[in-house]
């Protein structure tokens, strides 16, 4: 346990085709068993499908979809005097991004469809239009935080 200085957060290199750091992070999160080439192939195929369906540039569609899914607040359990309260807390930007990505990927994996790129494209388009499982999860999180607003003074 070093005590000299804080370690800076490593920023992954941007992806090759779209030169986007956010897309590179998403690809890494989607990867299973270290198969990055497979994850990259799935993601690029997914973005091509998005472009065919919308007729727009796929990267702004992906970015907007991620923005629509990122939560602003979440609830954390806090034990006070023998009872546990769900305390709403604001989320820092890096965690918001990570949760949004995780929810989109999880929803796409649970979706029914032919291939992962098809399911992922459908989920991203749903998130872009503010619908779908990942967006619903964000709404549920916000609703839970709103319901427990009375306990916000227990923040730490």
UniProtKB/Swiss-Prot annotation:
Taxonomic superkingdom: Bacteria
CDD domains in alphabetical order: uS7_Bacteria
Gene Ontology terms for molecular function: rRNA binding; structural constituent of ribosome; tRNA binding
Keyword rRNA-binding in record: yes
A biological process from GO: translation
Classification via InterPro entries: Ribosomal_uS7, Ribosomal_uS7_bac/org-type, Ribosomal_uS7_CS, Ribosomal_uS7_dom, Ribosomal_uS7_dom_sf
GO cellular component: small ribosomal subunit
Family: Belongs to the universal ribosomal protein uS7 family.
Subunit annotation: Part of the 30S ribosomal subunit. Contacts proteins S9 and S11.
Record protein name field: Small ribosomal subunit protein uS7
Taxonomic lineage from the root: Bacteria, Pseudomonadati, Spirochaetota, Spirochaetia, Spirochaetales
Annotated gene: rpsG
